[in-house]
Amino acid sequence: IFNKKGINFQKPTKTVELLSTFIEKKSKMLFGNDWFGDNLDKEQIKKFIMKYFTHVWLRFFKLQIPFLIRHRNTFNDLETWIVWGNIAISHQYYLHKLNTQNLIKEPVTFTNYYESVTAVKVNRGINASSIADISSIPRATVIRKLKWLVKSSVIKKNKNLEYQMRSSGKMNKEIGKNFMLNQNYVAEFLTDIFDYMKNSNFKI
């Protein structure tokens, strides 16, 4: 028997919010191209998602589920991927900061983006306690996952017991391939969503 109260816990309210923001940002990037037309604002996107939820969410799951499976296959489990992801986001922040200040010698492009993220020099890493706080994964589990990642030569530990990315290693090549593959799938997802909103019979 289904408990109706449980439905409230299944509502993807935060995901709809984040997805709407993401689609809006991509819409702004494409605005100005003759073939794209007007950009779409966040509230417009949210209304569309909620009105045609089953259509949009089916398309989202076709993106999200294979995405998670690819990372699980690479990292053995999703918790390890999340731990690694916190370190990667820290590097991504430093790369963005340096790029904004025009301190990057080689232009950051679609094809060299992941390599640039791993190679960027960071002043500080991120420690196990911070990763546990951010991810809500128990600290003992985080430490165990970090040890595996260090052993796999994907990350390294500095003298302050903080973790940073490494730019070499067989596993990094696999992660880089996943990154490129993911970008193609994201592009296909966005193409379908924009097509739904601009060219289909689905109207708000």
Residue ranges, per PLM feature:
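A short alpha-helical element within helix-turn-helix/winged-helix DNA-binding domains
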Residues: 1, 123-133, 149
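Short secondary-structure capping micro-motifs at structural edges
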Residues: 67-72, 116-118, 134
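Structural motif
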Residues: 71-79
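Short amphipathic alpha-helical interaction segments
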Residues: 136-151
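Short, Lys/Arg-enriched N-terminal segment that forms or immediately precedes the first helix
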Residues: 61-72, 95-100
